[in-house]
Amino acid sequence: MRAFAMSMGIDPQAFVRQMKEPIARSSIIYYPPQFSELGRKQFGVAPHTDYGCLTLLWQDQVGGLEVQNHQGEWVTAHPIEGTLVVNVGDLLMRWSNDVFRSTPHRVINRQSCERYSMLVAWDPDFDTLIDPSIVCADQESALYPPIRCGEYVLSRFDGSFSYRN
């Protein structure tokens, strides 16, 4: 998070100091082997953006992660052994006033073998005010209104899992 702040020319601790008690989530995801042609709408993980601040993703060598470029095309994100994929989430996009953009991505396992991935997502403290004006010259140039981290994350979580109700 320090590197993000430094690249924007703001206090290197601007984001870090808001992560004393961060909201963190982790997942291990299993994708079964595919032995037949996939339909156009069949996904391991449907197209989405990460709603939090920052996600670190490890994927095995099977592949299947695709990201959407600015032209709307899906591009394969080939696994590179010994590396992690760093995803900017929607919350960091808001906080940075769109300096950093969250990228739509999806997973389609087209292989006849199992696929695994692991992720860890970090967000600031629950009560942190996500205010893009910290990177703006003035409040009027902020693209988003301030919002509390926990309120935002819970609203996105509820939206994603609305079928629970």
Model-derived segments and spans:
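C-terminal flanking tails of non-heme Fe-dependent oxygenases
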Residues: 1-165
